Structure formats: structure tokens, C-alpha cells
Regions:
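Bacterial N-terminal signal peptides
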Residues: 1-12
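A residue-level marker of the well-folded mature domains of exported/periplasmic proteins
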Residues: 16-354
Length: 354
């Protein structure tokens, strides 16, 4: 299997020697339930595919582990009782606690999803989700008649901010006068709050909604109100069969499988893995029936440029909310700058809480 990674940080160190697949006992720690229909659902779908691809591999999952110190005893138990030699910690808020536990168990390999801190036996992984986010913005901008587009967002962290920015860049590429209105949830998974935020955006005049949350609640609200919606994580057309336009989606097996192979081979090293559409780690869900052929063609044309490496989303000129140029024409943001993004692009209505 190929190693699907783009690394801007130097490798810290090689892990321990080869670990036979039969003895690896990989564990996956999830922030939500497998049945959330989104983030955790897709991560577990990836796990299942990886298990099927490696004969003898038997994985363990722990669901609904809150971000914060609650993850520590879970990790300890997986190492001591489950004898896990590889652990995937699958949400941003586990970061510092994974590092603390990893210090005590140097012979265990940890991969932290969405984080940026590494150690000799701790790597990080994520996908270039901003790429399909931009493409979904092209769709949303094309389908909005009012130019008022809502975005239900989880937490004000760089992961979410760069997604909103990429989406807004896509929206305004085809609808230059459009505005993307952001509402913060301060939660990854809260169906009630997600639906409430969606209804508030619809009531404010938004005729297309996008989302960065873990369930299908926003899509359900849009279906009920007959407002177009762009999903996230998974193809969410099941929640909005007539109003779902498309969704940026994850193929987590493309991230998990290379790590399993490397640990088995004894070639794993601590690094930042960031795979994109080219590697198949992220993509765009099928278009809904409402999306016209000319919009589909525009999206496919830009998709081809991204996959080929001819062009990427954060290529200038790009201005921020204040109208100041942040990315000059002819230049593209570096990976570290994209990863640490803490400002909104022009055309976004809303603030980033400090």
C-alpha cells in the first residue's frame, strides 16, 4: 500500500520494530457514536474497510469519549488490557492528553486526528478537506438566488475556519456579491443545537446552508424548510432527499490503512500526514438532482485542476474581511499557514471568538 501523506514537518523518529498484524490490536477512540451519520460514522466505515484489507487484523473501538481528560483512562485501558500497539485518537480535543499518555508508552504508536503536536511515537493526520469544501461552495453559490448563504460551524479552531474560508471562496467565485453567514455551535455533536442554528439561518433569509457538524440535523432542517443544503462528512442525501446538493466527504481508510501497513513493516515515523483529493482521502458526494449540468461541469473542471496539482484553493489574490490582501496574486498559501488559519476571507459575515 502507498503512503498517502504530505508532510511539512520533519520526521521526529522511527517507531519500534515491526509489529505483526495479528498482534497489533489497533484501537480507535471516537468523540461521537458510530451512529451519528457523519464524522464518527465515516471514521468507523474506514476502520471496517481496513480490517477487511488486513487478514488477521482485529480492531477495537470506544465510542462517545468526550474531548478532554476523559480520554486518558480510555487510552490506558486500551494499552494495558487490550494490548493495543496502535491507537487512533480521532478528534482534535484529545491532543495534549494523547501526548501525556504516549510518554508513558514509547512502544505504542499513536495517530492523532486533526492535531498539530507530535512526539517520537505520536503522529498527526488529517485530510485536505478544504479542497472539496471549495468545490461545494461553487455549487452553493450557483444555487443561491438571494446571495445569502448560511454556515453552521462547530468550534472556532483553524480546522473549521479554513473550511469556512474555502467554502466562501468557492461561493464568491461564481456569486461575487454573496455573503456567507456563520453561526457557531461550540460543539461537534448536538443535533438539537444544530437544527436550531439551521432554522435561525433560514429565518434570517439564507436560501442555502452548509455545515461543519457531526450529524444530519442541519440537513433535516433544510429538507423540512425546503432550503438547499450542502452536507459534510458523509453523503447526507438520506436526511434531505430533495434538497441535498452535495457534500465534502471522508474516505478514512485512505488515511488509516497506510499507518497500519507502516507499523506492521516497522517503517512508521512521526510526521504530519495531510492527504487530499489526489490521494482519495477526501472527495465530493454525488450531486443532487437539482444541480444543473453547467454547475456540475464547472465543479468537475476545478476538481481536475486540484487533483492534477495545477491549482489549489488558497491561491491569491485573497483578501480578508477587512479588505486587506492576505495572499498575493500568483502565490499560494503554505501548508503551515493554511493549517494555522485564524482569519476569515472577504464575504463572510460573522466573527471568530477569541
Amino acid at each position: 500500500m502507498c503512503v498517502l501523506c504530505v508532510c511539512w514537518a520533519a520526521a521526529a523518529a522511527m517507531a519500534a520494530g515491526p509489529v505483526p498484524v495479528e498482534e497489533m490490536n489497533p484501537s480507535y477512540v471516537y468523540v461521537g457514536p458510530v451512529g451519528d451519520g457523519g464524522w464518527t460514522y465515516m471514521q468507523d466505515a474506514g476502520r471496517v474497510k481496513v480490517d477487511a484489507d488486513f487478514p488477521g487484523l482485529k480492531s477495537t473501538i470506544v465510542e462517545s469519549v468526550p474531548e478532554g481528560p476523559a480520554v486518558v483512562p480510555v487510552l490506558e485501558k486500551l494499552i494495558r488490557q487490550n494490548k493495543s500497539k496502535l491507537i487512533f485518537a480521532c478528534t482534535f480535543g484529545y491532543m495534549d492528553f494523547v501526548l501525556d499518555v504516549a510518554q508513558k508508552y514509547p512502544d505504542v504508536t499513536f495517530m492523532h486526528v486533526s492535531g498539530y503536536k507530535r512526539a517520537d511515537n505520536v503522529g498527526t493526520m488529517f485530510g485536505r478537506m478544504y479542497q472539496p469544501r471549495y468545490l461545494s461552495g461553487l455549487v452553493a453559490g450557483s444555487m443561491s438566488k438571494s446571495g445569502n448563504i448560511g454556515y453552521v460551524a462547530a468550534h472556532p479552531i483553524p480546522e473549521v475556519i479554513r473550511m469556512i474560508n474555502a467554502f466562501a471562496l468557492g461561493v464568491r467565485k461564481v456569486n461575487p456579491a454573496a455573503t456567507v453567514k456563520v453561526v457557531w455551535l461550540f460543539s461537534w455533536l448536538d443535533p438539537g443545537k444544530e437544527k436550531e442554528a439551521a432554522k435561525a439561518l433560514i429565518d434570517s433569509g439564507c436560501d442555502v446552508l452548509a455545515m461543519h457538524a457531526d450529524t444530519g440535523a442541519v440537513a433535516q432542517a433544510c429538507e423540512e424548510a425546503k432550503v438547499y443544503v450542502v452536507g459534510y462528512n458523509n453523503d447526507m442525501s438520506q436526511y434531505a432527499p430533495t434538497m441535498h446538493l452535495t457534500a465534502p466527504i471522508w474516505n478514512w481508510e485512505k488515511l488509516f490503512a497506510p499507518v497500519v501497513q507502516q507499523v506492521a513493516d516497522g517503517t512508521w515515523k512521526s510526521e504530519a500526514v495531510w492527504a487530499g483529493m489526489k490521494e482519495g482521502a477526501v472527495d465530493l458526494a454525488p450531486f443532487g438532482s437539482a444541480v444543473p449540468e453547467e454547475v456540475r461541469k464547472r465543479v468537475e473542471d476545478d476538481r481536475a485542476k486540484i487533483v492534477s496539482g495545477e491549482w489549489d484553493v488558497f491561491t491569491g489574490p485573497i483578501k480578508d474581511q477587512k479588505g486587506e490582501v492576505r495572499v498575493k496574486e500568483g502565490t499560494t498559501m503554505s501548508d503551515p499557514d493554511i493549517w494555522s488559519m485564524n482569519w476569515f476571507v472577504e464575504g463572510i459575515s460573522g466573527e471568530i471568538p477569541q
